[in-house]
Amino acid sequence: MPGKTDLMIKQAFNPYLPSWEYVPDGEPHVFKDRVYVYGSHDRFNGSTYCMEPYVCWSAPVKDLSDWTCHGIIYTGKEDSLNETGKRLMFAPDVVEKEGIYYLFYGLDTSDTISVAKSDKPEGPFTFYGHVHHKDGTILGKKKGDRQQFDPGVFKDEDGQVYLYSGFSSTPEVIERIKKKIQKQGLNIDINISTTGNLVMKLEEDMLTLKSEPVPLLPGVSNSKGTGFEGHEFFEASSMRKFKDNYYAIYSSVNGHELCYAMSKYPDRDFEYKGVLHSNGNIGIEEKPSYYYANNHGSIVEIEGTYYIFGHRHTHYTQYQRQGVAEKLKMNPDGTFDQAEMTSCGLNKGPLKALEDYPSYIACVLMSKEGACKEDVSMDSGLHPAITQDENKEAYITNIQDGTVIGYKYFDYQDVSQISVVVTSSLDCQWDIYIGNKKVGVLDIKKCDSYTKVTTKVCVENQVNDLRFVCRGKSVLKFKSFSFN
């Protein structure tokens, strides 16, 4: 059967999965002719991180808009450390070894690493065992062992598998975590570090340590003079190799950013190189242009193009995170430029300004006071948010005077009008900007149900962004927009 032509392929957006799906911490891997994403699984309206079992999504490498859900691939109930069967599972990673796919993960409030396996990349996976020392002691349980967290696995070209792990924070945050564990009545003594992450080799059985854990990237207490200052390791270890360079990808102490370091070796001599992605677009913009918090992901090469996968935050908390992806530019020396937050993400180019789009693909979202860290302390009465209704239909809520909603990028060709579908508590106006030019105004009347509002615009043929700026005392919900 012939492959799809460009005209047959749908467009890809951010987030790249359906609006009702919440799979953060995405580790992308290409197996044969498909890219698979393995991540945590948040619950809409959940009260904490990772409340759902693991699912897997994949897409053909030639059509990154065509994602398939393979359903629940692992529940963790078979894990002998999951005594109640109700423990949550944090960020996983997967590696293939001799035709078997191994899923590495950690349970909540755990200091160990568990492993499940399958003969297919999409699972289902069955419990296999726990990573352990040569004497059989589970890693994390021996006296002096560091806490294990966010395992990343990497198979080198010679077949050797490396395991990366670690959570490294400030003393203040560590104290808060320990108090939270005590408050929950858990009798767990976790050795949390401030000195970065660890690397170790695995034996052929994928469970036994071939080498003891050694430090890799520095944390806040040992970064002086290393070049990592201000971007020390926090969590989310991931390793990749492209051409002759190894890339250690991680989330820094700043939380919102995915950083990277480079080396000629997978287990030593890494030099800090920069930021790959910020879910607040910090670094591309001087101030955040989207509500930001923790980030986790990695790089994948697909059909000769590099992409960084991460996640964004929605619904006024850090517990409903959605996967996003952006193109990366590799420089001649192997370094990458930071990726800008966009709405087009995995698309082959800018989106076509000639059809309907859902509002939730916004990559710019902020109140008149700007954007801030997404957590329970933020003023939900002031700030807009992406959320969903009882039918799992996504929309932007709490749009008020000064709210800015933006999309990047569109290919404008002969566009003469723009429409939005909204509800509004009062009459108001939306200014429409393309680039820095105001191209039209939407006059929105009070409407209790979704109503389409259209205005004529004067737009030159170009590739550019789209921004709506609300003026007036109305509070709105925003479902979708369209061109012509």
Q: Where are these predicted regions, by residue range?
A:
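Carbohydrate-active catalytic/glycan-binding domains of CAZyme proteins
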Residues: 1-441, 445-484
